Amino acid sequence: MTTAHILGFPRIGAQRELKFALERYWRDGASADAERALVDTGRALRAEHWRIERDAGLDCVTVGDFAWYDHVLTTLAHVGGLPRRFGFDARALTLADYFAAARGNAAQPAMEMTKWFDTNYHYLVPEYSPATTFGPGVEWLFDEVREARALGYRAKAALVGPLTLLWLGKARDGLVERLALLPRLVPAYRALLARLREAGVDWVQIDEPIFSLDLPDAWRDAARPTYEALAPGAPKLLVATYFDDASEHAALLKALPVAGLHVDLVRADAQLDAFVADYPADKVLSCGIVDGRNVWRNDLDRSLARLAPVRDALGERLWVATSCSLLHVPVDLAHEPRLDEELKTWLAFAAQKTREVAALRDALVKGRAAVAAEFDDAAAAAAARRTSARIHNPLVKRRVAALTDADARRASAYSVRAAAQRARFGLPLLPTTTIGSFPQTPEIRRARAAFKQGVLDHLGYLEAMREQVRIAIDKQLAYGLDVLVHGEAERNDMVEYFGELLWGFAITSNGWVQSYGSRCVKPPLVYGDVYLPEPMTVGWASYAQSLSAKPVKGMLTGPVTMLQWSFVRDDQPRATTALQIALALRQETLDLEKAGIGMIQIDEPALREGLPLKARERAAYLDWAVRAFGIAASGVADDTQIHTHMCYSEFGDILPSIAALDADVISIETTRSNMELLDAFETFDYPNEIGPGVYDIHSPRVPDADEIERLILLALERIPAQRLWVNPDCGLKTREWRQVDAALAAMVDAAKRVRQKVEEAAPA
């Protein structure tokens, strides 16, 4: 019979149970009681997620999709591959060790973190050196298999594949080629797979999303011998590709000695023909037709029409699946009691998507009539969404159509603007600032919760937030920072805040997804044309500026990041939606400028994240992304300084486009990579000002002034002092004030030391 399965389920829990359990564990100092509570939470979550999968009608549950922090880190733990610098015993790895690798400890900084392909999920980057070894690791996967079997479930295991695991890492300490480690890694996988077979696992899903990339020949050539080594003695292997078109590798993948392949038909529907043609008789083909990355309800009739010919060709060897893991969508629409009822009928979260997969399987096997009610309901929702008047705003469409190239460019060149800004602000060499947010304290959270519950009235909430702004300004003045921020106490999220105030956006109550570790975000839903009805940030920025003579930056989230970190409508091009958001932000920048705010930061941390995986598609994306930023930023006068911020990015390959943004100042995350990101600036003469991060805010570890001074000096080897800023890697929302106080004081101290050295070294 045709099999229905998913590639993975969200691990955080419907009420973010994993997040809160992790934070209690860390807060309690990883005590034995705290660890027991954490382990119990994980076990309960897995059982609940498997129950949802079973109740939806899936033919198997997926084990191995759970991770305490990150699935790449967990895979490294399974094959004994955590960085050697931590000195951990791979076979005796504890949870405390695991979290030390993720978050750093007193002896070692945390592992580097970056985006998982083109998603908003972050993985921990493996570190590979000539001394790297692999072997037996933790027992967690086998524990999960035993749990699932004890509950009576048929379990399919899921693992990040060996080629993808190597591809995602960084070569260090003189290692020339990561593939050189493959002969060491394959035996570790082979042993892991053999044990899974002994444990009674019939199928193992091996995730190899790198086959959706433009792979070098050496990596393509490594695929067949790798799987020839893995297949003997293993359970049946399902090699899963997703996130883009893998058809250029179709012949290679179909020739692998595995039992099946998975392809993503949501992101690359056209690839199906290349796989179905001459498909091997000994393989299943898993078709990912339910979107694992967006929240819109599946058009079941359309999907059935797409799958029916495949069913005719392959029979029971057709499997129905989600396009990728459901890690990227919220858990359950049932937990959205306050969401607009019409909008709700257009949506499907993870729990609903599992049922969509099973319903498609049922229609293929039993006929549409067997699930007619579900199909008819989905068809009615799709028709209503196509014709809903709430989606379309004629005024917005006219404004987008009227945009010209001049609207996306500043009136004067950077050199002219820089002179005007120096005259206006009079900043010292190596000016110090922060990225925007300060700690979201319990006081802030209590006030926000009381306001949302109606316990605190609007005026009381404003007063509470103003007090937090005053605290943030006073602290920054005490540190000695040169450019201040208001701290964003009023914002629960850098995208959701704006989504609450813009027309065309909707906000969920419980639509959380994991960003990394315990960090969860609640992406807004962009369901219709975007319009700014009134100023969003002017009152907060103006109040903060009234508290100090030093400049205070206005803080906005850029159009591409708003797009990338939301669940975006799929009925028009993303470029069009980006321009709509950009027009709204342009009006906000003009309102800020009119209110006397002389520096405005438009954050674009997701610019590179939106880059298509295929090289041939990138130029078009960068063109509209740069244009959208320009529309948002270019209406202001020469002496208004536009900042932007980018984090978690390796962007050497898009530096020309970053330069084309023409922001007066850009700040970037560089600490975890030890300023390696700045290597690109040795060959590309970035024309404007730049602030490479000198403090890793993702780790609780507090750097001292000597460490920060070393990083500033490293930056000065690549960036002229006249164009260098000093700032943390990212916003400080997730840190505690005691950490921030120490780190920013050290940062200002380090900047003053280096400033003195530079000035003393300058010719008289």
Curated annotation (Swiss-Prot):
Q: Which positions bind L-homocysteine? A: I435, G436, S437, E488, D603
Q: Which Pfam families match?
A: Meth_synt_1 (PF08267), Meth_synt_2 (PF01717)
Residues involved in 5-methyltetrahydropteroyltri-L-glutamate binding: R16, E17, L18, K19, K115, R519, C520, W565, E609
Q: Binding residues for L-methionine, per the UniProt record?
A: I435, G436, S437, E488, D603
Record keywords: NADP included?
no
Tell me which Gene3D superfamilies the record gives. Answer: 3.20.20.210
Any one of the GO BP annotations:
methionine biosynthetic process
Q: What is its EC number?
A: 2.1.1.14
Q: Give a yes or no for keyword Metal-binding in this entry.
A: yes
What does it catalyze?
Answer: 5-methyltetrahydropteroyltri-L-glutamate + L-homocysteine = tetrahydropteroyltri-L-glutamate + L-methionine
Q: Which residues hold Zn(2+)?
A: H645, C647, E669, C730
Function as written in the Swiss-Prot or TrEMBL entry: Catalyzes the transfer of a methyl group from 5-methyltetrahydrofolate to homocysteine resulting in methionine formation.
Entry similarity comment:
Belongs to the vitamin-B12 independent methionine synthase family.
Protein name per its UniProtKB record = 5-methyltetrahydropteroyltriglutamate--homocysteine methyltransferase
Q: From which organism does this entry originate?
A: Burkholderia pseudomallei (strain 1710b)
Organism ancestry? Bacteria, Pseudomonadati, Pseudomonadota, Betaproteobacteria, Burkholderiales
